[in-house]
Amino acid sequence: MTNNLKQRRIILDLAVTLDGFIEGKNGEVDWCIMDPDMGFTDFLNQIDTILYGRKSFDLWGQYIPKNEDPDTEKELWKLVHSKKKYVFSRTQNEIDNQAIFINDNILEEVNKLKKNPGKDIWLYGGASLITTFINLGLVDEFRLSIHPVVLGEGKPLFIDVKQRINLKMVNTRTFSSGVVQIVYHWNG
């Protein structure tokens, strides 16, 4: 009998500006285009777990759309909140009904997660957590949606990466909004 269970992958799926920023200088993400053709719902159906840094979790991990927001946005957030959430934090350590907090032993804890049965895992961010995962060799797939805007300043995607990373491009897609999505695999 063959074993059809494959190890779960850590996928960094992120919007980024042409000049490499994931947020503007004041944390703004108003430049991010939610293009329905990008298949974000399909991506969310491919995962069952989301990994957040504490700041990202505080901002987005518990986000509730406003009553006046479109139904499509409400459905999207409902799908996001249906996923199991892990928060990486040096300061918070409680487990609540919204998330499981991980304070140390990141490499070991994430490798345990990857070996558990389930769908792929979304590395949501923020930038510091992304850097930690890259430096530990934990990112399996980079799925970057490059938006047609140059901010000039803001929070860069890659900070303090300590090694050269050779990637293999596996897919590119372009959208009428001007967004270009590039998918790379890394066998770090």
UniProtKB/Swiss-Prot annotation:
Lineage: superkingdom: Bacteria
Q: Gene3D superfamilies from the entry?
A: Dihydrofolate Reductase, subunit A
Q: Which UniProt keywords apply?
A: Membrane, Transmembrane, Transmembrane helix
Cellular component (GO) terms are:
membrane
The record's annotation in Pfam families points to:
RibD_C
Q: What Gene Ontology terms describe what this protein does at the molecular function level?
A: 5-amino-6-(5-phosphoribosylamino)uracil reductase activity
Q: How does it sit in the membrane?
A: Single-pass membrane protein
Q: What GO terms describe the biological role, i.e. biological process, of this protein?
A: riboflavin biosynthetic process
Q: Does Protein biosynthesis count among this protein's keywords?
A: no
TM region positions? 121-139
- Please state which protein family the record places this protein in: To B.subtilis YwjB.
Q: What is this protein called?
A: Uncharacterized protein YyaP
